[in-house]
């Protein structure tokens, strides 16, 4: 129904449905993030032609409204994302070499998104943050936006691991490892902000 970020953000409601009704749940999702549901019992499909027989259906983005109408609350953070211990340890060792408070930063979204100009922030707008002492910044960019680092005033204070990150079949696998080993995330509205929040990382 929506993008990858929305799927990550609102999938918590699917887990609430499963818990309350003990239902067999079928999710049509993006194949690139199938591994994020590996701990669940959900049946995943990636093509509308392969939808099996079902009793009820609902669009993912409708679930928050239904839940709120019934409870007048929003569910607390539910971390359903599996962790790869090997990858997490790899990034723990790498990031331990960087002493002090670590902030992950994501400033540029996918340029092909229709209103990307309303969400992405030029890297140089963050200049003042880089003047704060004892703060280390970790770039969480992959692809779009990396070209801005070359002319960034504080590029010597920005750690860029983009060439080592998420080069396998499973999107976000290294990003998750990095997120679990930093203190804070500052991000535009992209899939990454929903990923870090779901993992329980303090996110702005």
Q: What do these predicted ranges mean?
A:
Residues 1-204:
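Catalytic machinery of carbohydrate-active enzymes
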């Amino acid at each position: 129904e929506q993008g990858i970020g929305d799927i990550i953000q609102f999938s918590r409601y699917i887990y609430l449905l499963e818990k309350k009704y003990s239902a067999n749940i079928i999710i049509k999702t993006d194949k690139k993030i199938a591994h994020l549901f590996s701990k669940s019992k959900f049946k995943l499909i990636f093509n509308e032609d392969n939808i099996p027989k079902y009793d009820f259906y609902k669009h993912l983005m409708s679930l928050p409204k239904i839940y709120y109408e019934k409870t007048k609350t929003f569910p607390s953070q539910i971390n359903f994302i599996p962790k790869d211990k090997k990858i997490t340890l790899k990034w723990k060792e790498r990031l331990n070499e960087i002493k002090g408070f670590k902030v992950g930063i994501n400033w540029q979204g996918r340029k092909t998104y229709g209103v990307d100009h309303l969400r992405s922030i030029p890297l140089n707008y963050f200049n003042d943050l880089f003047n704060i002492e004892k703060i280390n910044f970790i770039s969480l960019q992959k692809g779009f936006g990396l070209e801005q680092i070359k002319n960034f005033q504080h590029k010597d204070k920005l750690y860029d691991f983009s060439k080592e990150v998420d080069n396998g079949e499973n999107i976000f696998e290294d990003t998750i490892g990095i997120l679990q080993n930093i203190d804070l995330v500052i991000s535009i509205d992209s899939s990454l902000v929903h990923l870090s929040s779901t993992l329980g990382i303090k996110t702005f």
